[in-house]
Amino acid sequence: RNDFENKNLLSPRFNAKYNLKDGVSALIYNAGKYYQNPPEIYLSIEENSSLKSVNTFQHSLTYERLLTTSTKLTLAYYQKTYSDAPMLSSQLPRTEPTFLLDRLAMYSGVLSTGSSQTNGVELLIEKMRAENFYGLVGATYFNAIYDDYDNISRNRDYNYKYIMNVVGGYRPEAEWEFSVRWSYFGGKPY
């Protein structure tokens, strides 16, 4: 299907940054509306020809602070909502209440009625390369849910609740670099 290319959708975005009087901190607010095509696996089926572009609105409030000349701390709250997402109809026999952006399986009779919401808090400490060291430590606590075709709120497939990442490295000379990466996250929701 190429008819998605014939539509114009307005996607406004807004970004404001306020530098605090201490000279090393800032508050940042971002908001925006985004569109994306439904997955091609659904668009390829004629019965799904009425699907719309998935609509997303997201916004965040962020506090940023320079701890040193090469180290920055960021703390953010964010929220993202989806609408018009692909969803199975409750009228179809033997359908499970699945948020179809999470699982790509071949279905016909898909509707643009899905909705989802994600809220989270993220902490990030970044150390830019200085004196041959660099790294970052990041942690996120979030909740990602969707409403199924019976309007029951359910966990999305990737709703792990928390994720932590540590990445770091040391470059003793231009030809050598040692790095490490470690990730920890909650289990898949059931």
Identify the meaning behind each predicted range.
Residues 1-22, 37-38, 42, 151:
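Signature of Gram-negative outer-membrane beta-barrel scaffolds
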Residues 11-13, 43-50, 89-99, 142-143, ...:
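Flexible, surface-exposed loop regions and adjacent strand-edge segments
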Residues 8, 16-20, 53, 65, ...:
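Residue-level signature of outer-membrane beta-barrel architecture
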Residues 1-6, 21, 74, 121-122, ...:
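Face-selective signature of the C-terminal outer-membrane beta-barrel domain
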Residues 1, 41-48, 56-58, 102-110, ...:
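Extracytoplasmic loops and strand-loop junctions of Gram-negative outer membrane beta-barrel proteins
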Residues 19, 26-30, 53-113, 117-119:
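Membrane-embedded beta-barrel scaffold of Gram-negative outer-membrane proteins
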Residues 104-189:
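Gram-negative outer-membrane beta-barrel transporters
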Residues 1, 16, 29-33, 75-79, ...:
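Transmembrane beta-barrel strands of outer-membrane/channel proteins
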